[in-house]
UniProtKB/Swiss-Prot annotation:
Protein name (Swiss-Prot/TrEMBL): Cell wall synthesis protein KRE9
Record's subcellular location: Secreted, Cell wall
InterPro entries: Kre9/Knh1, Kre9/Knh1-like_N, Kre9/Knh1_C
Assigned keywords, A-Z: Cell wall, Cell wall biogenesis/degradation, Glycoprotein, Secreted, Signal
Role noted for this protein: Involved in cell wall beta(1->6) glucan synthesis.
Post-translational modification remark: O-glycosylated.
Signal sequence extent: 1-21
UniProt key word Nucleotidyltransferase: no
Taxonomic source organism: Candida albicans
Length: 271
């Protein structure tokens, strides 16, 4: 039996979480079933590159892929991954067929972890949807294979997009940008006084369209905003604190009792 690795969530906390758009796993599908009754379960994993070609997370910049079969998380919040099926392999295409030996795992629900290293030193981790393995004969005491909930979130580390982005990208109006990654202008601070007497639109209006059916991958995966190129100044407010009230009054002094005239009463009976 393969010795599986326990990946602790406490270690994952150190990884910077952000919107990760490089590996968009298209198969296996959620709930899909694969059988190992022939001696092994053969599964083709496919994915798309949903990032821009000029992005550091484009798969054109990928160095190696590590693919592991995982399950969980356990009641302690840990995921369980077997020894990698693919170890830091350079994959030219966007698919890889893996074989899972029949005697390595029991029947149950699993997902793939795809760990990608990039030329700039960055890394990403992606998880496929859960699928079901049947016809397996591996030991049942070590893996939590009954979990059917959501898989862990995608993760990325080592991509300082705010500093590596082309500064010219921030000068293009947002509505005119077309890439998966968009660039917003730097946030400005308000002035000390208002001098304008009329208002005007800073940018022209743009059309809005809505999806009529469920869409596939997002049109925009991430928006990058540059840091401030200035230092915001602040000052202490030396105004005295307002004193507590010195007079209280009962509510009855501010409430008057409702009255109705005799003529109004008679009119109500006649109506």
């Amino acid at each position: 039996m393969r010795q599986f690795q326990i990946i602790l969530i406490s270690l994952v906390v150190s990884i910077i979480r952000c919107v990760v758009a490089d590996v968009d796993i298209t198969s296996p599908k959620s709930g899909e079933t694969f059988s190992g009754s022939s001696g092994s379960a053969s599964i083709k994993i496919t994915w798309d590159d949903s990032d821009d070609s000029d992005s550091p997370k484009s798969l054109d910049n990928a160095k190696g892929y590590t693919i592991s079969l995982c399950t969980g998380p356990t009641s302690d919040g840990d995921i369980q991954c077997l020894d990698p099926l693919v170890k830091n392999e350079a994959i030219a295409g966007k698919s890889k067929t893996v074989s899972i030996p029949q005697n390595s795992v029991p029947n149950g629900y699993y997902y793939f972890q795809i760990y990608v290293t990039f030329t700039n030193g960055g890394t990403t981790i992606h998880y496929s949807p859960r699928f079901k393995l049947t016809g397996m004969s591996g030991p049942t005491a070590t893996l939590d294979v009954t979990e059917t909930g959501s898989v862990p979130a995608d993760q990325a580390s080592g991509f300082d997009t705010a500093t590596t982005a082309d500064s010219k990208s921030f000068t293009v109006p947002y509505t005119l940008q077309t890439g998966k990654t968009r660039y917003a202008p730097m946030q400005m601070q308000p002035g000390t006084k208002v001098t304008a007497t009329t208002w005007s639109m800073k940018f022209p209006t743009s059309a809005v369209t809505y999806y009529s059916t469920k869409a596939g991958t997002p049109n925009v995966a991430s928006t990058i905003t540059p840091g401030w190129s200035y230092t915001a100044e602040s000052a202490v407010n030396y105004a005295s604190v307002a004193p507590y009230p010195t007079y209280w009054y009962p509510a009855s002094e501010r409430v008057s009792k409702a009255t109705i005239s005799a003529a109004t009463k008679r009119r109500r009976w006649l109506d």
